[in-house]
């Protein structure tokens, strides 16, 4: 190479690394991050909305929400607890004195 023309020649430097022929790692990372964000969004949606919606829909089918919370056991409605009248009040019973029964 002529020293006078050396200023006009640039060294040959590759502009990009050769591809390995597989899926680029940036694409794998992108899919992993988007999947993780979608999973978190679905979980928060379940916590804030879907869980209450499921309880409301099941309660409309004739089961109370208490029955749903304490399990899927059927309640025995054939022998309900009777409504008993309250015992008669005795008026003002007075101050509490320990040991007097």
UniProtKB/Swiss-Prot annotation:
Its main location: host cell. InterPro entries: Gemini_mov. Keywords: Host membrane, Membrane, Transmembrane, Transmembrane helix, Transport, Viral movement protein. It holds the Pfam family Gemini_mov. It is a single-pass membrane protein. It is found in: Host membrane. One of its GO terms (biological process) is transport of virus in host, cell to cell. Residues 75-101 are annotated as: Disordered. The chain crosses the membrane at residues 30-50. GO terms for cellular component: host cell membrane; membrane. Belongs to the mastrevirus movement protein family. Involved in the viral transport within, and between cells. Interacts with the capsid protein (CP). Part of a MP-CP-viral DNA complex. This is Movement protein. It comes from Maize streak virus genotype A (isolate South Africa) (MSV). The lineage of its organism: Viruses, Monodnaviria, Shotokuvirae, Cressdnaviricota, Repensiviricetes.
